[in-house]
Regions:
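Short functional hotspots at interaction and active-site rims
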Residues: 1-162
Length: 162
């Protein structure tokens, strides 16, 4: 996620061109990491900069693992930083099961749909600093109701216990 997020489409009165201000400075890259349960977002973190193996390992050990319950299933895509043995060990030591999605299959990843809504919210709000992104994330995550989270999970073909 970058601080140059803008809406891609706009409306304007008939006969006039839609226009908007675009920042011309260098943007900043931020990484949003979260876990999606059928009831809520959990283990949410925002990092200043791109994701690397050290950052992901710290996220798993310090943020994700404390929220896991025995029997939880952690589903990860095939990003290289997800395949660290220390990450696997930390998740399994918490009593959770680790599963990887098939390659090139975002349709099976419910958090991708939720992040699309999240990015639309951030585009409308136009954060330009790391602090603004963090503040807006708190606001945006409150917009996700438990029914909506369950629907994201169901839409990807997973069963949701009632």
């Amino acid at each position: 996620m970058t601080t140059d997020l803008l809406r891609r489409y706009a409306r304007s009165p008939r006969g006039t061109r839609a226009s908007d201000h675009t920042p011309c400075s260098h943007w900043q890259t931020h990484t949003v990491v979260a876990a999606l349960r059928p009831t809520e977002f959990t283990a949410t973190a925002v990092f200043d900069g791109p994701m690397d193996s050290i950052t992901f390992r710290a996220y798993v050990e310090q943020v994700l693992v404390p929220t896991l319950r025995p029997g939880d299933v952690v589903v990860l895509d095939n990003l290289a930083v997800h395949k660290q043995p220390a990450v696997h060990a930390a998740i399994e030591q918490a009593g959770a099961h680790l599963r990887f999605l098939p390659p090139y299959s975002p349709d099976f990843n419910p958090i991708e749909q939720a992040f699309a809504k999240l990015k639309a919210f951030l585009r409308a709000a136009r954060p330009r600093t790391f602090d603004q992104v963090c503040d807006l994330m708190r606001t945006a995550l409150a917009l996700f109701l438990s029914d909506e989270c369950a629907n994201y999970v169901r839409h990807c073909g997973y069963r949701v216990a009632t």
